[in-house]
Structures are given as structure tokens and as C-alpha cells.
Regions:
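Conserved small/polar residues in nucleotide/adenosyl-binding loops
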Residues: 187-193
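Generic structural signal for nonpolar/small residues that stabilize regular secondary structure
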Residues: 147-149, 176, 189
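Glycine/proline-rich active-site loop of Rossmann-fold NAD(P)-dependent oxidoreductases
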Residues: 126, 139-142, 154-174, 183
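Alpha-helical structural motif
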Residues: 13, 34, 168, 172, ...
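Generic alpha-helical structural context detector
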Residues: 82, 151, 174-181
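N-terminal Rossmann-like NAD(P)+-binding domain of SDR-like oxidoreductases, especially those catalyzing
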Residues: 1-157
């Protein structure tokens, strides 16, 4: 089962996934903020685990729109957890971010380092990680995995899927790739002082 609201993706990706995998799957166009829609999805499907990649993810935009980021990312995750709990689904893999290591910690990073952030996007990841820890502490039948990765890049070897956001990419390498293939035109690029290039 795949759920997406297409806020930063395209429906064509679904057909490409089917082509690559040779499998069909249920798809729901829904938003995590819509608890009724989530409950309908759980009602109609036997879901054992959730891989949670949903959320707004542009650091710069999060500084300009902090309320939208907190509402979408945190409230959306809370709605998802409520639906999961109601339907007895207690396994979740959460797409967090290496941004939770904050500016103080130095590489190489370890999972026992304290978390912090420098922007609303990062704080949503820190807060959601804590929410999921608290869910586990309250009921250790839950299985919670937190993925703290840097900006992943690349595509399937077929070239059918990879990062293809709506609009101009917010990450450097996808932006360079779109300039290289002529999808977007070159503009002078200024990196923030805290960029990890």
C-alpha cells in the first residue's frame, strides 16, 4: 500500500515503480493530516508495518514557513500513529535526518549523541523521533526504527525513478542534475554558511 498526497511528487512515479517491480499495489491519494482517510486505508488493508517518508523537507522553506512545517510534519505523524495504534499496527520505520545531530556534534556521528537542530525542519525530525521513543516507552510491543541519513542521491539503474521533485530541487545534486539535462536553467548558486557539501 502506498499513500501520497503528491505535494512534492508525481503520479507517474507509481507506474514506474510497477514497471520496475513487476508488481501491482494499492494506492491512496491522501494526506496524513486526514485521520479519517488514514483510518479508511487501515480498515481496507491488512497493514503490518509502516515506512514513513511523508513530510515537508526543505530547510530554507521551513525557516520561512515554520508553522506549516510543524503542523504538517508533526501533526501528520501523530495522525498516522493514532491510526496505526487503532488498527494494531505497531511497526514503524521513520525517515528522520542527519540534521538531528545539529551544529555541535562532529563527524563521525554516533546514535548516542545528543540531538538538536538549527531550523524548523530539523526540529520536526527531533520532535518526531522523541514522540516515537515515547510511544515505544508507553508500549514496548512497538518496533521503532529511525533512519538518520544525509541527502540521499541517485536513481534506479533503469533511470525510471530517482529524485524528481515538483519545481526546483532544494538539494544541490538534484539541482545540478536538472541543470545538466536542461530541466532548469543555470543560476548563480549561493550556499548557506552551514552547508555540508
Amino acid at each position: 500500500v502506498i499513500v501520497d498526497n503528491f505535494s512534492n511528487s508525481k503520479p507517474e512515479a507509481l507506474n514506474r515503480i510497477k514497471k520496475i517491480t513487476g508488481k501491482d499495489f494499492a494506492f491512496y491519494e491522501a494526506d496524513l493530516l486526514d485521520l479519517a482517510a488514514l483510518e479508511k486505508i487501515f480498515e481496507e488493508n491488512k497493514i503490518d508495518a509502516v515506512i514513513h517518508f511523508a513530510g515537508l523537507k526543505a530547510v530554507g522553506e521551513s525557516v520561512q514557513k515554520p508553522v506549516e512545517y510543524y503542523h504538517n510534519n508533526i501533526t501528520g505523524t501523530l495522525m498516522l500513529i493514532k491510526a496505526m495504534r487503532k488498527y494494531g499496527c505497531k511497526k514503524i520505520v521513520f525517515s528522520s535526518s542527519a540534521t538531528v545531530y545539529g551544529p555541535v556534534n562532529k563527524a563521525p556521528y554516533t546514535e548516542d549523541m545528543p540531538t538538536s537542530a538549527t531550523n524548523p525542519y530539523g526540529y520536526t525530525k527531533v520532535m518526531i523521533e522523541q514522540i516515537l521513543r515515547d510511544v515505544y516507552v508507553s508500549d514496548n510491543d512497538w518496533s521503532v526504527s529511525l533512519l538518520r541519513y544525509f541527502n540521499p542521491i541517485g536513481a534506479h539503474k533503469s533511470g525510471l525513478i530517482g529524485e524528481d521533485p515538483n519545481g526546483i530541487p532544494n538539494n544541490l545534486l538534484p539541482y545540478i542534475c536538472q541543470v545538466a539535462v536542461g530541466t532548469v536553467s543555470y543560476t548563480h548558486l549561493t550556499l548557506p554558511t552551514n552547508s555540508r557539501v
